[in-house]
Amino acid sequence: MLSIVVLLLLMAEGSSQNYTGNPVICMGHHAVANGTMVKTLTDDQVEVVTAQELVESQNLPELCPSPLRLVDGQTCDIVNGALGSPGCDHLNGAEWDVFIERPSAVDTCYPFDVPDYQSLRSILANNGKFEFIAEEFQWSTVKQNGKSGACKRANINDFFNRLNWLVKSDGNAYPLQNLTKINNGDYARLYIWGVHHPSTDTEQTNLYKNNPGRVTVSTKTSQTSVVPNIGSRPLVRGQSGRISFYWTIVEPGDLIVFNTIGNLIAPRGHYKLNNQKKSTILNTAVPIGSCVSRCHTDKGSLSRTKPFQNISRIAIGDCPKYVKQGSLKLATGMRNIPEKASRGLFGAIAGFIENGWQGLIDGWYGFRHQNAEGTGTAADLKSTQAAIDQINGKLNRLIEKTNEKYHQIEKEFEQVEGRIQDLEKYVEDTKIDLWSYNAEFLVALENQHTIDVADSEMNKLFERVRRQLRENAEDKGNGCFEIFHKCDNNCIESIRNGTYDHDIYRDEAINNRFQIQGVKLTQGYKDIILWISFSISCFLLVALLLAFILWACQNGNIRCQICI
């Protein structure tokens, strides 16, 4: 059996070197055994030679501190950092692009609430820096620097270090306080102040003498007036009283007035606001590492090599857009038509209409030929480069279309009614649905264009060769031409590079074409004549047989008897 196989291989090899038919040249395109399926405008499953995944599905398990500056709040959230709670001293003067709030952050001072918490949190985060400017406040006939056992610093009773707790004087006096601060600077000031709510009337009079107290804070355009809400509450860090913190922004040229007869938690200064800063905040437990990335999510940092991601809808920085799809593939190669097995011992060749060529690795398009000198394959770099020039940069163009700074944070509503929260969620979901649809459509459109461009360049190559050969060759209908004149490898090369001279071979090609067509016609008539001759012979044999039977019956040599 082995000897038979060897013999067949030798015959096939020998045949390629002793080819006696007309030269044949075929146009073809690159193919691979297993391509990649992509979606186009007209088909959900089109196999292409190569494709690139556009949806990022992997992230780093850490946050990258470069090039964006990250500040880790550790046990402090951003509001406690601004108030100056114990344990937040590491945030003094901190500056950030992204403030990292930890889910494990806790309050470490007197129990408090902020009626407009999210707005204050957003202002502080966007400011990008804790730049506190201390000021002198002249409070008369009151005791300052109140402390609490709920707010210990180094095991000593203390308080928020950015605020001043005012209580009655040792002489049991808390006269009306009326203090004005004018903003003569060129930046807006953020003042944070508070109102203490004692748990009992006794506590109220012990601390402030006056019952009820009152705090009013005004600017030229706003006024906030608060009367303490006295009442018993659950103990938190040993305290049933509470503090409500408020904030006021004073623009340049404006002023702020503090008016109180008790219960004021006064500021010790203000925070400088920077309207040009575009910083933000991220709540996550992911640790900060030593990597480099411009995009952060609550799951970790991402690279920006792909235009889309489906890791998290919470994304900060220069990030891929979040989409619902787990995969979107961009075609970066032509339609894939895997090559068929060689047919017969003589390795019949076929062009692009029947299949692609897996051996064509130097280009997308190329030639195969068969002539008296053998067979060969060569890439056509001109058509390949023309297609690549149009297709290259698709990924960059796609990224440019989605390259705007993308900052999407899930809102945290604490004290707004559920209908607003539901509306916000609906808007965010609708935005994501829209982006997901746009992404899928955009990729399908680009894929359709890629395949159309690739097919167009293949057709251009075929037409270029056809115009060169003209009547010197015949289109075989499968992407190949049968050439009607002798065409050695130099001749084949001239067809490939576009220098083929049709006139040189014209007379030879016409003569050979007529001879070949005449042989074909003669062979056709021969078949017809054979069939006619066979039919006449059969007819004559039957006629002779009938004549013999009639003659024999007349002479009595054969008697026919018919019975009914």
Swiss-Prot record:
Residues 1-16 form the signal peptide. GO terms for cellular component: host cell plasma membrane; membrane; viral envelope; virion membrane. Disulfide bonds join C26-C480, C64-C291, C76-C88, C109-C151, C295-C319, C487-C491. It is a single-pass type I membrane protein. Pfam families: Hemagglutinin. Homotrimer of disulfide-linked HA1-HA2. Major glycoprotein, comprises over 80% of the envelope proteins present in virus particle. Binds to sialic acid-containing receptors on the cell surface, bringing about the attachment of the virus particle to the cell. This attachment induces virion internalization of about two third of the virus particles through clathrin-dependent endocytosis and about one third through a clathrin- and caveolin-independent pathway. Plays a major role in the determination of host range restriction and virulence. Class I viral fusion protein. Binds to sialic acid-containing receptors on the cell surface, bringing about the attachment of the virus particle to the cell. This attachment induces virion internalization either through clathrin-dependent endocytosis or through clathrin- and caveolin-independent pathway. Plays a major role in the determination of host range restriction and virulence. Class I viral fusion protein. Responsible for penetration of the virus into the cell cytoplasm by mediating the fusion of the membrane of the endocytosed virus particle with the endosomal membrane. Belongs to the influenza viruses hemagglutinin family. This is Hemagglutinin. The lineage of its organism: Viruses, Riboviria, Orthornavirae, Negarnaviricota, Polyploviricotina.
